[in-house]
Amino acid sequence: MERDTCDVLSRSKSASEETLHSCNEEEDPFRGMEPYLVRRLSSRSIQLPPLAFRQLEQADLRSESENIPRPTSLPLKILPLIAVTSADSSGFDVDNGTSAGRSPLDPMTSPGSGLILQANFVHSQRRESFLYRSDSDYDLSPKSMSRNSSIASDIHGDDLIVTPFAQVLASLRTVRNNFAALTNLQDRAPSKRSPMCNQPSINKATITEEAYQKLASETLEELDWCLDQLETLQTRHSVSEMASNKFKRMLNRELTHLSEMSRSGNQVSEYISNTFLDKQHEVEIPSPTQKEKEKKKRPMSQISGVKKLMHSSSLTNSCIPRFGVKTEQEDVLAKELEDVNKWGLHVFRIAELSGNRPLTVIMHTIFQERDLLKTFKIPVDTLITYLMTLEDHYHADVAYHNNIHAADVVQSTHVLLSTPALEAVFTDLEILAAIFASAIHDVDHPGVSNQFLINTNSELALMYNDSSVLENHHLAVGFKLLQEENCDIFQNLTKKQRQSLRKMVIDIVLATDMSKHMNLLADLKTMVETKKVTSSGVLLLDNYSDRIQVLQNMVHCADLSNPTKPLQLYRQWTDRIMEEFFRQGDRERERGMEISPMCDKHNASVEKSQVGFIDYIVHPLWETWADLVHPDAQDILDTLEDNREWYQSTIPQSPSPAPDDQEEGRQGQTEKFQFELTLEEDCESDTEKDSGSQVEEDTSCSDSKTLCTQDSESTEIPLDEQVEEEAVAEEESQPETCVPDDCCPDT
């Protein structure tokens, strides 16, 4: 069996190498990658990947060549189905866990702190993310498989476990059960570690000696694999970091595949790597101008960006408008706000009808809907004063990270908090923290990335030591504004409540730093899979770490929710993020800096960037969230897949190059962006910059387009002001595509 496995992998690898050499440089990379996103037909029980696959992953981490995978036919389907059980009804203390002596009227009390994990049943052949690919999948050429075939299709019939720590627990459970069977100890009273599903009973007296020895040998191999995993775990790292490192390694391979297939694929790969992986870059800081030098002489004694505004003088409880702001279209606005509890609220329409006050209107509506004003004794005039002051500190001239985005994230978080699976799970204070964090999470955003601020030696980067620069600034401004006149909406909270809320808000907003994405995803997936393996299907959420982890991922999902919204909204968000990226690219060009990935308006592929963004970032995140709240997020996943297919269909087809061009493309592959991901935080690779500059200098990309803003003002923004004759001729031979605005990740 071992020889057969090696032969298959060897043949697959050869086929992969031959196909890679034959592909055209400008061929669409994502069509080739589609077979890797396997379709799950059903999910009925938890299942470990075969031991041979797990050993391949382990071997990939080792430098010793003698570590040969040991295949096994050990039956692994011994883990429990996710059962529905009662949630714990005790209260929860943010600092100290459950508290039996808390009054039912205490806003910190939760009616139920347990989250029930539901079994994943059949759902319409949806593709799975790259997280469910085994290491052996990477040896298969994307060109050698049809769209509907997958080597992993048999494996994925059940709920496959992919996080290493959960795999170790499941494997040890297998070892325990087989040990009990081999030693005739099955008659003992069942314990919490006994199998909770229908496992075929094995009796030593009824099986042959050969089968007995085979089962014993394979059980020993499982135990060896567990020991190998645990030996690599360092004491200073958490078990969820095992998953984080694994996911980063898998994403690294995916991006390397993508970068080798086309110039635009290389650009998308570089963007995803630079934005969503926690990597440090050595940069050449340009010499500051005289004006900048004079500006930096001022002491950093105050939080920058805070403006003195007066909204409270004209507000009294008796004259507060119905939705917090004055508007001549109150009835129409009321009609739109009827969808405030639904996914896909038309937030751009809300902005138009409210005089560009969507954040104030939506926050006020949600606070009324959830009765938070009464629960926390918040004066309505104080709430409106704070919200208008906060909204004024979002920059109207920033295309994406503005008050409309903040309102969208607030409303999305509100809907996610209301999902049936999370009913009665979180306390009122936790709900308040999540909504408040969503409202302030991008306040005073300058429209450039953290890396831009670091590269330009900005005052903010100096103040926050290059660590989550913008996220720290958003928090500082959001809390500082509470000190303005009649703005303290938390004035009637107890000291303990206020401290707890502040801690939660800080943890949630810092988690919106996109460079922390893979760590967040790995933590959530490890927690979900571990609970599936070790319990009857209930996440107790009886400690602060678990609860804040769910809230962090919830707001992170809301922040990356644009591709899951109706296509009309998604396209508008795409236009906006690309406009913001291009403005940053223009500033970098003016300064003589290297232009950041996806920020060069002369060389950007909007459609391919969205497909890659969904495949490698959004889909894995929402797939994991949907696992947590199953089946509540299935419609969201369906919309995400539909939107992905739409952008896929709009990718223009490039004509096949001549043989000479093809040969030239092969030679150029050695200059492609190379992803050398170092998993240890202290020694990240920074080789991307040198090789990535090759791509940015080439402005003849045929994927540049005109961005059609579908806002209320319907403006048209030319992305290519000067296009080379070859690119023009190439575009004329293809159908013209209008790329609308939409969602792209927070930078």
UniProtKB/Swiss-Prot annotation:
Residues 325-654 form the PDEase domain. The modification Phosphoserine is found at S238, S240, S287, S314. Binds 2 divalent metal cations per subunit. Site 1 may preferentially bind zinc ions. Binds 2 divalent metal cations per subunit. Site 2 has a preference for magnesium and/or manganese ions. InterPro entries: PDE4_UCR (IPR040844), PDEase (IPR023088), PDEase_catalytic_dom (IPR002073), PDEase_catalytic_dom_sf (IPR036971), PDEase_CS (IPR023174). Sumoylation of long isoforms by PIAS4 augments their activation by PKA phosphorylation and represses their inhibition by ERK phosphorylation. It is found in: Cytoplasm; Membrane; Cytoplasm, Cytoskeleton; Cytoplasm, Cytoskeleton, Microtubule organizing center, Centrosome. Inhibited by rolipram. Activated by phosphatidic acid. AMP binds at H401, D442, D559, N562, Q610, F613. 3',5'-cyclic AMP binds at H401, Q610, F613. Its EC number is 3.1.4.53. Residues 701-712 have a biased composition (Polar residues). There is a cross-link at K326 (Glycyl lysine isopeptide (Lys-Gly) (interchain with G-Cter in SUMO)). Zn(2+) 1 binds at H405, H441, D442, D559. Residues 14-24 have a biased composition (Basic and acidic residues). GO terms for cellular component: apical plasma membrane; calcium channel complex; centrosome; cytoplasm; potassium channel complex; voltage-gated calcium channel complex. The keyword Signal does not apply. Mn(2+) binds at D442. Residues 718-734 have a biased composition (Acidic residues). Zn(2+) 2 binds at D442. Signal peptide: none annotated. Homodimer for the long isoforms. Isoforms with truncated N-termini are monomeric. Binds ARRB2. Interacts with PDE4DIP. Identified in a complex composed of RYR1, PDE4D, PKA, FKBP1A and protein phosphatase 1 (PP1). Interacts (via N-terminal region) with SHANK2 (via proline-rich region); the interaction is increased in a PKA-dependent manner. Belongs to the cyclic nucleotide phosphodiesterase family. PDE4 subfamily. Hydrolyzes the second messenger cAMP, which is a key regulator of many important physiological processes. This is 3',5'-cyclic-AMP phosphodiesterase 4D. The lineage of its organism: Eukaryota, Metazoa, Chordata, Craniata, Vertebrata.
